[in-house]
Amino acid sequence: MKKRKLILEDGTVFNGTAFGSDAESSGEIVFNTGMTGYQEVITDPSYCGQFVTLTYPLIGNYGINRDDFETVTPFIHGLVVKEYSEFPSNFRNEETLDEFLQAHNIPGIANIDTRKLTRIIRKHGTMRAVMVDEQKNEQHVIEQLRLAEMPRDQVKRTSTIKPYVVPGRGLRVVMVDFGAKHGILRELTRRDCHITVVPHNYSAEAILRLKPDGIMLTNGPGDPKDVPEAIEMIKQLLGQIPIFGICLGHQLLALACGADTEKMKFGHRGANHPVKDLLAGKTYLTSQNHSYAVNVSSLVNTDLELTQIALNDDTVEGIRHTAFPAFSVQYHPEASPGPEDTNFLFDEFLNLIKASKVKQGGEVYA
């Protein structure tokens, strides 16, 4: 099989076997510790522009199916695995992982020490990396990699271009798409919401014209500070319409309320991150994927209350506004993949909408 190199900006070189596309690619290298759900991970728009290292040692053994996509077009720039299974065995399998990556021009590399790679990322933090043919001059590639600028327009790439409607008979929810997973849409449709999905740069005025009962701020890739128009939009909507933010949406809500965000050393990516609910006194297992987090000290002197923390490192995992009907979480309550411990948050969102409508003297249709 064809050989390929994975080269990190710190000069570390991994020699492995190529699969997927023959294209050369660069991106930020991260790792995900989930044992299953590689299809959902690969198609999660929040990984836009990244090389995803899967720490579970065997990947591809159940192939790719049409049911588990989180977006139609994957946005990852590369896939890194220990061992790639060429012959998947699963009753839902429709194509191999290799065929899927080839179809979307995404390179992969296998037969490298993913434990060593993960330890490097944990020690030194996420960094730029490149996948190239084994013949390339390593020193030249490293020099070019260190000079490369990482893109900052990931949300623009992953957001819908124009609004569309997913009809339902219940509450009217406007979903602001920063790179939304289909799992969020599925949870709202299961609850019979009438959903209007709008682009990331939609104005507050345009959203209010849709007469929504609630606003969903979705997940998405990159630095929340790269989406200033969304922060301004949220500021204008606060207090008018109930808001629920997930992942990037959580960070944007925090920024809109005067808090701050910061980049983490290597982020949270996996399906078993424990989170403590400070209000309920309960602990949940959660699915997570984020490089940025809300700075806990920045919550002081804002109208935000800390509601949940990560048990591994005390990262802010949940906040709520003390005056307005708005709350958010850093993790993914829709899972996809992962545990569904916090799926009830979608019901809490709808209950918040209903309570707000009753308070305002309006009718509740669901």
Swiss-Prot record:
Query: Which Gene Ontology terms describe the biological processes this protein takes part in?
Result: 'de novo' pyrimidine nucleobase biosynthetic process; 'de novo' UMP biosynthetic process; glutamine metabolic process; L-arginine biosynthetic process
Which keywords does UniProt give here?
A: Amino-acid biosynthesis, Arginine biosynthesis, ATP-binding, Glutamine amidotransferase, Ligase, Nucleotide-binding, Pyrimidine biosynthesis
Say which species the protein is native to.
Oceanobacillus iheyensis (strain DSM 14371 / CIP 107618 / JCM 11309 / KCTC 3954 / HTE831)
The residues that the entry says bind L-glutamine are S46, G220, G222, L248, Q251, N289, Y292
Q: What is its EC number?
A: 6.3.5.5
| Protein name stated in the entry | Carbamoyl phosphate synthase small chain
Q: Where is this region: CPSase?
A: 1-171
CDD domains recorded for this chain?
GATase1_CPSase (cd01744)
Q: What GO molecular function annotations does the UniProt record carry, in alphabetical order?
A: ATP binding; carbamoyl-phosphate synthase (glutamine-hydrolyzing) activity; glutaminase activity
Write out the catalysed reaction. Answer: hydrogencarbonate + L-glutamine + 2 ATP + H2O = carbamoyl phosphate + L-glutamate + 2 ADP + phosphate + 2 H(+)
The UniProt similarity line reads: Belongs to the CarA family.
UniProt KW Coiled coil keyword: no
Role according to the record = Small subunit of the glutamine-dependent carbamoyl phosphate synthetase (CPSase). CPSase catalyzes the formation of carbamoyl phosphate from the ammonia moiety of glutamine, carbonate, and phosphate donated by ATP, constituting the first step of 2 biosynthetic pathways, one leading to arginine and/or urea and the other to pyrimidine nucleotides. The small subunit (glutamine amidotransferase) binds and cleaves glutamine to supply the large subunit with the substrate ammonia.
How would you classify this enzyme at the top EC level? ligase
**Catalytic site:** C247, H332, E334
What PROSITE patterns would the database entry show? GATASE_TYPE_1
Q: Which gene encodes it?
A: carA
